[in-house]
């Protein structure tokens, strides 16, 4: 049986209006930029298991300006062909209490896992918990920005980052992984970390020139769907992440708020010929998936458990 979502706003990753129980973001700032100087290690062997932690000593690693990679002409630091790449960037937070949201942007080829102070905050095209240096991502993926596209937006779960981010020095660490290993003809590793600030005073660097996040609040649930900057086709379905922002005790919900109701992998495609060719707003068929991309039942907004949704 298929169920239909009701009263959910679908957002596309700005201006904030209205506040009602949610700290209002005044503006956005950049904590980490792709063209910062990163420490990096070419992944042709396994690193220390603590490489992403704040206590790890990376003084023996190479350093270079991001993005880092080879083969696409979008790399400030060019490296040799490799199976994967490990990167670390330290940054300073000056007023933690003023930060309301974190957004990670990633332009990558082919998969990645990102860590904040040693804890995972985002991943794409990786379906194993801790990928080894020679892990092979499930699918091939090309970077977008050098082709005129956009970086992928990841809203970092506040329930996670709030317990990680500290005043003073922090570490963003990213493992970027090639499909087909060192035989791959290219690799792209470009990452940014932005924060939404509630005060009018600028504390950190200005956001990237292209930064744009659709900020608003809603009295009904907000549905975030991330297809990693891939266009949703008629067929076949593509992979993505679906999140629902909803709290029974809140009167308003923000697009950058905690996805406390649901976070799940999905496969999504356009649904119905009328949706594609007649109506300006498309209908979609969604199948929910577990960590390993197997079918899984979910119960969004206390609806009956199901894996197929429209």
Q: Which positions does each model-derived feature cover?
A:
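GGW-centered surface loops in extracellular recognition modules
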Residues: 24-55, 212-219
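Phosphate-handling architecture centered on phosphoinositide signaling
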Residues: 187-310
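Bacterial N-terminal signal peptides that target proteins for export
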Residues: 1-9, 14
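Surface-exposed, low-complexity/disordered Ser/Thr/Gly/Pro/Asn-rich loops and linkers
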Residues: 54-90
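Aromatic-lined ligand-binding clefts that engage carbohydrates, nucleic acids, or primary amines
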Residues: 38, 61, 91, 97-118, ...
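An acidic-aromatic loop/edge-strand motif
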Residues: 127, 139-211
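Extracellular and analogous surface-interaction loops
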Residues: 88-98, 159-163
């Amino acid at each position: 049986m298929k169920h239909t979502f009701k009263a959910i706003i679908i957002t596309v990753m700005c201006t904030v209006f209205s506040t009602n129980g949610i700290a209002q973001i005044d503006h956005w700032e950049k904590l980490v930029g792709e063209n910062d100087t990163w420490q990096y290690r070419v992944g042709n062997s396994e690193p220390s298991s603590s490489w992403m932690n704040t206590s790890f000593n990376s003084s023996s690693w190479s350093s270079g300006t991001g993005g880092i990679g080879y083969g696409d002409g979008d790399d400030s630091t060019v490296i040799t062909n490799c199976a994967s790449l490990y990167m670390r960037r330290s940054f300073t937070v000056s007023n933690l209490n003023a930060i309301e949201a974190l957004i990670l942007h990633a332009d990558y080829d082919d998969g990645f896992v990102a860590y904040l102070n040693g804890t995972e905050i985002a991943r794409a095209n990786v379906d194993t918990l801790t990928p080894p240096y020679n892990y092979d991502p499930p699918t091939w993926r090309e970077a977008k920005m050098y082709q005129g596209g956009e970086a992928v937006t990841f809203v970092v779960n506040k329930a996670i980052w709030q317990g990680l981010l500290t005043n003073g020095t922090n570490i963003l660490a990213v493992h970027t992984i090639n499909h087909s290993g060192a035989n791959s003809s290219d690799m792209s590793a470009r990452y940014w970390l932005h924060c939404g600030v509630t005060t009018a005073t600028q504390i950190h660097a200005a956001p990237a020139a292209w930064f744009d996040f659709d900020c608003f609040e809603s009295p009904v649930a907000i549905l975030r769907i991330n297809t990693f900057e891939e266009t949703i086709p008629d067929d076949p379905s593509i992979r993505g992440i679906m999140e629902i922002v909803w709290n029974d005790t809140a009167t308003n919900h923000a697009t950058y708020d905690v996805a406390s109701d649901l976070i799940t992998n999905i496969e999504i495609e356009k649904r119905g010929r009328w949706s594609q060719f007649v109506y300006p707003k498309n209908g979609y068929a969604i199948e929910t998936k577990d960590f390993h991309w197997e079918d899984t039942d979910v119960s969004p907004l206390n609806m009956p458990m199901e894996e197929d949704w429209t």
